């Protein structure tokens, strides 16, 4: 087993919910959490600024020698370029896929409301993933 910690970041403290869930399902894993409370919220910023902040957050976690990075931030998850994520030296995931899957699994009438920051909604990422999951 890889002894390195899992890295989790958010634009604030909301990602601590993800950390709590990780601790529940992976009790033996160490976790490094970075909450960027100095620049919260990310969602009112432009795309380039959000990506710049995400890069800085990721660099910080990589400096802590993490084995996996989770962006527990809907804004970063919907804005960070997938091609950049693919080039990282460790696996990277965000929250869009898991959140969209939970919404699709929970709906009874195939109607899902999306509440998010301006940047998250503007990205269209949740709508795209949800539509792909329900095959509309």
Regions inferred by a protein language model and the residue ranges of each:
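Glycine/small-residue-rich loop that forms an oxyanion/phosphate-binding "nest" at active or ligand-binding sites
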Residues: 68-70, 74-110, 115
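A short, N-terminal amphipathic alpha-helix
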Residues: 53-68
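Conserved small/polar residues in nucleotide/adenosyl-binding loops
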Residues: 134-136
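Anionic-ligand binding region
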Residues: 124-129
């Amino acid at each position: 087993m890889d002894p390195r910690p899992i890295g989790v970041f958010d634009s604030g403290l909301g990602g601590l919910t993800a950390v709590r869930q990780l601790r529940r399902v992976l009790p033996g894993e160490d976790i490094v959490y970075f909450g960027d409370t100095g620049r919260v919220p990310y969602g009112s910023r432009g795309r380039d600024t959000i990506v710049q902040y995400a890069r800085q957050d990721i660099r910080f976690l990589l400096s802590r020698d993490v084995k996996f990075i989770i962006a527990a931030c809907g804004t970063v998850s919907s804005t960070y370029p997938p091609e950049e994520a693919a080039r990282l030296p460790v696996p990277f995931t965000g929250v869009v896929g898991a959140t969209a899957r939970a919404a699709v699994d929970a709906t009874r009438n195939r109607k899902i409301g999306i509440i998010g920051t301006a940047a998250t909604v503007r990205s269209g990422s949740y709508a795209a993933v949800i539509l792909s999951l329900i095959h509309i």
